[in-house]
Amino acid sequence: MKVFSVAVCVLFFIMACQSPHSQVLSINHELELVIADYQYYKDHQSPFNRDISGDTNAQLPDLSPSNLEQQYLALKVIYQRLAQVDVGKLSQDEAINHAVLSYTIKNQLDNYINHEHYMPLTAESGFHVWISRINGQVSFKTEQDYRDYLARLAALPKYFSQQMFWMNKGIDEGITQPKIVLQGFEDSIKAFIKTDVTTSTYYQPFSKMPAYFSESLKSQLKTQAAASISEFVIPSYQKYYDYMVQRYQPSARDNIAASSLPNGEAYYLNRLQYYTTLPISVDDVHEIGLAEVARIRLEMDDIITQLAFAGSFADFVNFLRTDKQFYATSSEGLLKEASFIAKKMDAQLPKFFKTLPRTPYGVIEVPANIAPKYTTGRYSGPSRDDQAGNYWVNTYRLDRRPLYVLEALTLHEAVPGHHLQGSLAREMKNVPKFRNSTYISAFGEGWGLYSEYLGVEAGFYQSPYSDFGRLTYEMWRACRLVVDTGMHAKGWSRERAMNFLADNTALSLHNVKTEIDRYISWPGQALSYKMGELTIKKLRNMVELSLGENFDLREFHDQVLKNGSMPLSMLETIIIDYVEKKKVVLKEEKQ
C-alpha cells in the first residue's frame, strides 16, 4: 500500500511539473487512444470495413436488434470519452481529428436514436442496390476470394429478412418513407430478378476469372455461382419485391414532411444541423435560400436580355426544355460530351491546385436498374486501391438530359469537384484511417458547387446557354434551401415544391420530380450544397481581403482540401490560422 501511495505521489508530482508542451503531448495521446478504440470498433462493426482477409470476407453485416444495440452502446462510451478531451489543448492536427470524429460518432448515435435503420431506402435507391455492389469490395484473385463471395450470396436471404424486420418496425411505429415517393420503386427491385442468372449483377465476378485458374475450377465456380444466385439471390429479391408491393407501399405514410414523424420537428432540426454542420435554424436556412434565389434570378434575367429572347422567363425555360438542339441524340454522344468536358478541365487543374491526386477516373452510365428515378449524375469513388473513381452520367430519357448544364454537372462530379476532393482525402498520409474515408456532405457538396463556379475562372461557360445552365444549377441548390425546409418544416406540399423548382430553374420536369422526391425521402441532405458553397466563398473572400496581392488561389485551395472532409466550423478555424501564419511570414520577409 505504501509503495502504491508513493507511486501515486510521484505520478502527481510529474503531472504537476509537466510543461504546457508535454501536457499537449499527453492530451494528444489520450485522443489517440480514443481514436484507436474507434477504429477497432469500426473495423469490427461491419465485415466491409476490414482490411484483413479471412472469415469476414464471407460475411454480411449483422443487423439483428442485439447487435445494433451493442454497437450503439459501444459508440456511446467512445463518444463520452471523446467529450472529455480538452480540445483547447490539442494540436491543430489532433483538433481536426477530434472535430471529425465527434461529428461522425454523434451522427451515428443520433441515427440509432431516430431509428434511421427503419428506413433503409430513399426514393432513388435502397439497401437492395447498395448490397449489390459487394462484388466491388474485394479483388477476385484467389479461389478463396470466390468462395467467400459465394458464402456472402448464401447470406443474402438473412440480410434481406433483417432489413424487412426493421421496415416492419417502421410501419408499426409510423416511421416509413412517404407513399408518394415510392411509386415505381418496385421496378428497381424487379431489375435484379433475372431469368438468366448469368446476366445478374451478382454473376459479374464469374464472367472474367483469372487466367491462372484451371478450366475445371472456372467451370466449377460458375456452376456454383449460378446455383447460388438461383437459390439465394433471386428469391431474396422476389421476396422483397412482394413485400414492397403488398406490405410496405400500402402501409407507407401519406404526409411527406419529416416533421410528421414521431418527434419530427426535433428530428428535422437534427438532420438540418448535421447536413450543414452549422448551429442554424430552419427559418434562417429558408431565408438564406429565398435571398439566394432572388440574387441568382437577376443574373439569369441578364442572360435572357443579352440573348434578346422575345418572351418571359417561363417562355425561355420552356424553349430550353423543348428545343432539340440542347439534347444529345444517343447515350454514347452524351457520354462523349461529358468525357470531353472532363478532359478539358483536367488540363486546367495545375492553374488552380498545387497538389493533385494520383487516382484516375472514368465516365460511365448510371446503371440501368436505378436510372429512371436516379439523379442526373453522381460520382462514385473507388472501394479498393486497384480501382478508379467513376463519374456517373444518367442517359435515361435523353430528352430530359440537357447539354447546357453538362459543364456544370461535370465540374461538380468529376474535377475539380468530387473526384479531386475525394481522391485527395483518400490519399492523405499520416492521418487516422477513418479520416481517409470520412465524407461530410456540407464540405464535399459545398466544394462541388464551388467547383462549378471555378469553371467561370477556368474559361468554361462560353455559350450564354451553358452559362445559364451554370446559373440553373446554382439556382437549383438555392431552391433546395427553400423547398427542403418548406416541405419538412413549413407545411409545403409536394406540388408547391415542384412548382417552385420548375418556375425558377431550367431543369427538365422529369428532373424536377425526381429531385423533389429525393429531398422528401432524404431530409436535410439537399441543404449541404449551398450552405457549404457559401462558406467556402466567404472564406476565400476573407483570405483575398486579408492578403491582398499576396493571395495565392492555388495555395488557398490546397489549404481547403489538404485535410479532407471536416465540419465547416473547423475549416474556418484552419483558414483563419493559415492567414495569420501567412501574415507572419510576409512580415518577416519584409524585415
How should each PLM-predicted stretch be described?
Residues M15-A16:
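C-terminal motif of bacterial Sec signal peptides marking the signal peptidase cleavage site
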Residues K2-C9:
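Sec-dependent signal peptide recognition
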